[in-house]
């Protein structure tokens, strides 16, 4: 007689479903200011505790607490606030434009604005970011033209990518923003390779790689960590844990009773787990990781704990798989509201300025959209010739494409 019970496959389940409020206790939160700040030359193994705790600076009253509460220039905080506000207003307007069938698709970053903007302001513009489709706040922090961004979304005749990328797959070299790929996890290995090349050339530029919680299940994630560790690549490896990979709960990729940051330590990489809705913590952690990279001390992995407040995309309905009011119960709050509270408390923002800035960006986005739509929209605009599909792909067109173009008669 077999002494063992039949085996059962374990499949992680979300702690909340429609009609049932989410239990967020799995997040392992601690109070602001409790996480220690190690020296930049810390050994990776000595960051194990930081990969399971949470670096937080702003408390519930809006005060900066603990060793990560750096003396940040208030102008940086103001730039961060403006970038986050602009991102949120831009996102809201573009979702409406998609519903009006002016573009085919859109993905907003509602609730995640601090992560991209905070790191963008902590890096140099010459550093290269390898983002996913939810880091448009990097572009906002670096003042990229709203008209150019909207033309890409509309796939119109002024689209710098000529309609060959999905909307929101921007490519802005002059802003240190590498071409977004629709294939998940590819940018992680690309960033490590770019960082290795920078080191080989003896340059001073570093790379910043981005990935979502779900895509960490891809093999490219593990390949990137291996190469980054072995060659001490000057790269920041960002894992945005927004709790959901489309409709799949984050534990399906990350497992239970562990963290994504813990994987970095296991690969010999100094790792942090950070409150991604705390702009001050984002900026401080990003500066720490950038300093490690610039000093030749190797890569750092940062898990940003945040929440995808909106749908995965305009093709998604999150009410089918999670509580409709989930974001209102998320314990780390709204990044804009938290930084606003802090700035007002230190005397560098006001309710009046907040309203004025909101109105400023609403007007700017509306004006940029009107200008961009003059070059066409998805529903109304120039239709490229069949010949254009062969252009601007290769510097010198190869023979097989010449033959194909001749067969089409274009």
From Swiss-Prot:
GO terms for biological process: branched-chain amino acid catabolic process. It catalyses: N(6)-[(R)-lipoyl]-L-lysyl-[protein] + 3-methyl-2-oxobutanoate + H(+) = N(6)-[(R)-S(8)-2-methylpropanoyldihydrolipoyl]-L-lysyl-[protein] + CO2. Signal peptide: none annotated. It holds the Pfam family E1_dh. It comes from the Bacteria. One of its GO terms (molecular function) is 3-methyl-2-oxobutanoate dehydrogenase (2-methylpropanoyl-transferring) activity. Keywords: Oxidoreductase, Thiamine pyrophosphate. The branched-chain alpha-keto dehydrogenase complex catalyzes the overall conversion of alpha-keto acids to acyl-CoA and CO(2). It contains multiple copies of three enzymatic components: branched-chain alpha-keto acid decarboxylase (E1), lipoamide acyltransferase (E2) and lipoamide dehydrogenase (E3). Belongs to the BCKDHA family. This is 2-oxoisovalerate dehydrogenase subunit alpha. It comes from Pseudomonas putida. The lineage of its organism: Bacteria, Pseudomonadati, Pseudomonadota, Gammaproteobacteria, Pseudomonadales. The gene is bkdA1.
């Amino acid at each position: 007689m077999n002494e063992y019970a039949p085996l059962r496959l374990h499949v992680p389940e979300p702690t909340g479903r429609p009609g049932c409020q989410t239990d967020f206790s799995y997040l392992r939160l601690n109070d602001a200011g409790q996480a220690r700040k190690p020296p930049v030359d810390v050994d990776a193994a000595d960051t194990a505790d930081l990969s399971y705790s949470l670096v937080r600076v702003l408390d519930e009253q809006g005060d900066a607490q603990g060793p990560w509460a750096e003396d940040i220039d208030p102008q940086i905080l103001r730039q961060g606030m403006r970038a986050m506000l602009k991102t949120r207003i831009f996102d809201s307007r573009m979702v409406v434009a998609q519903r009006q069938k002016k573009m085919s698709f859109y993905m907003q970053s509602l609730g995640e604005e601090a992560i991209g903007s905070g790191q963008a302001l902590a890096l140099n513009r010459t550093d290269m970011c390898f983002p996913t489709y939810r880091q448009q706040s990097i572009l906002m922090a670096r003042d990229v033209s709203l008209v150019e961004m909207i033309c890409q979304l509309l796939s119109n005749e002024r689209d710098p990518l000529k309609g060959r990328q999905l909307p929101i797959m921007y490519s802005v070299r002059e802003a240190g923003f590498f071409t977004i790929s629709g294939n998940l996890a590819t940018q992680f290995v690309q960033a490590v390779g770019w960082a290795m090349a920078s080191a080989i050339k003896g340059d001073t530029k570093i790379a910043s790689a981005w990935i979502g919680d779900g895509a960490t299940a891809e093999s490219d994630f593990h390949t990137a960590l291996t190469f980054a560790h072995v060659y001490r690549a000057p790269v920041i490896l960002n894992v945005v844990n927004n709790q959901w990979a489309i409709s799949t709960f984050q534990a399906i990729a990350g497992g239970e009773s562990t963290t994504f940051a813990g994987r970095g330590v296991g690969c010999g990489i100094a790792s942090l787990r950070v409150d991604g809705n705390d702009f001050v913590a984002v900026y401080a952690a990003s500066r720490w990781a950038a300093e490690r990279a610039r000093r030749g001390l190797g890569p750092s992995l940062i898990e940003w704990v945040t929440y995808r407040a909106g749908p995965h995309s305009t093709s998604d309905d999150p009410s089918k798989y999670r509580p409709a009011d989930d974001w209102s119960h998320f314990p780390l709050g709204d990044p804009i509201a938290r930084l606003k509270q802090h700035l007002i408390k230190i005397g560098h923002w006001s309710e009046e300025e907040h309203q004025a800035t909101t109105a400023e960006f609403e007007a700017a986005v509306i004006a940029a959209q009107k200008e961009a739509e003059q070059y066409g929209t998805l529903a109304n605009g120039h239709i490229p010739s069949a010949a254009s599909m062969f252009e601007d792909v290769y510097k010198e067109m190869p023979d097989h494409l010449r033959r194909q173009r001749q067969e089409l008669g274009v």
